[in-house]
A protein has these predicted regions:
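Sec-dependent N-terminal signal peptides
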Residues: 4-12
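Positively charged n-region of N-terminal signal peptides that target proteins for export
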Residues: 1-4, 19
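Extracellular glycan-recognition regions
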Residues: 23-239
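C-terminal motif of bacterial Sec signal peptides marking the signal peptidase cleavage site
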Residues: 14-16
């Protein structure tokens, strides 16, 4: 009888230990896990804020088909608030890292069709970077930063025949850097910004949308997490 009681207590102890281990695994930080596993990203750790018309995952590629009249913008200049673009993100408390992704928008064909990277915290605090189709001559490579419910937009015109773009999103505490690349090797700075709501846990990932009456399929691939590629400033010291 005594031995049976001991065995029962051991079984209960092991079960409790296993439950704690499962809980620990479930709560593992997504970025820290990727950094510990040769930069590989488990696509199953991404979560939708809003789902697209269609989504398909094959290998390391995510195909996202947009719905018409989907967008992200808050107030500035246009005086409207659009907050219904599909956003697929993972969350992290890691304060120093970089996220890289390749986008393919060969199917974009209508004004304002776009896809790229995003850090969507809530409707009034987010950033994004993308190529936005304009016409058969050119499109906009740009970024939007929204702090406290007001968006800005910084762009440069690129040829309309550009159909792929790489992005690198880097975090250093509550400051952020967005870079772009034509080949995934040589990156150029697009934007440095501060996010007022971006000091703690954040969510970041990918998005695609079609603000007007159109739809297209965007492809996202070659995603990875690395140590922060945005190096600390080596000039004037902080105040």
């Amino acid at each position: 009888m005594k031995n049976l009681i001991i065995l029962a207590l051991v079984a209960i102890s092991l079960a409790a230990c296993n439950q704690k281990q499962v809980k620990k695994m479930e709560n593992t930080d997504n970025v820290q896990t990727a950094l510990a596993n040769d930069d590989r990203i488990d696509l199953g750790r991404f979560e939708w804020t809003r789902e697209p018309a269609e989504c398909e995952i094959k290998g390391d590629t995510i195909a996202v088909t947009t719905k018409p009249h989907t967008d992200l913008w808050q107030r500035t200049y246009y005086h409207f608030r659009n907050d219904n673009a599909p956003v697929l993100q993972m969350k992290t408390n890691e304060r120093f890292f970089s996220f890289v992704v390749k986008t393919d928008f060969s199917q974009s064909h209508h004004r304002f069709d776009q896809c790229g990277i995003v850090m969507y915290l809530d409707s009034e605090n987010w950033l994004k970077a993308s190529v936005e189709y304009e016409n058969e001559q050119f499109q906009h490579l740009g970024s939007v930063v929204t702090n406290g419910g007001y968006s800005d937009w910084a762009t440069t015109a690129i040829p309309a025949d550009v159909k792929t773009m790489w992005y690198r999103f880097s975090r250093r505490e509550d400051d952020y850097c967005i870079e772009c690349s034509a080949d995934g090797v040589h990156f150029s700075q697009m934007r440095i910004c501060h996010m007022h709501a971006g000091a703690g846990e954040i969510r970041f990932g990918i998005y695609a949308c079609s603000p007007e009456d159109s739809s297209f399929t965007a492809l996202f691939s070659d995603m990875k997490i690395t140590a922060c590629a945005w190096q600390a400033h080596d000039g004037q010291q902080p105040d």
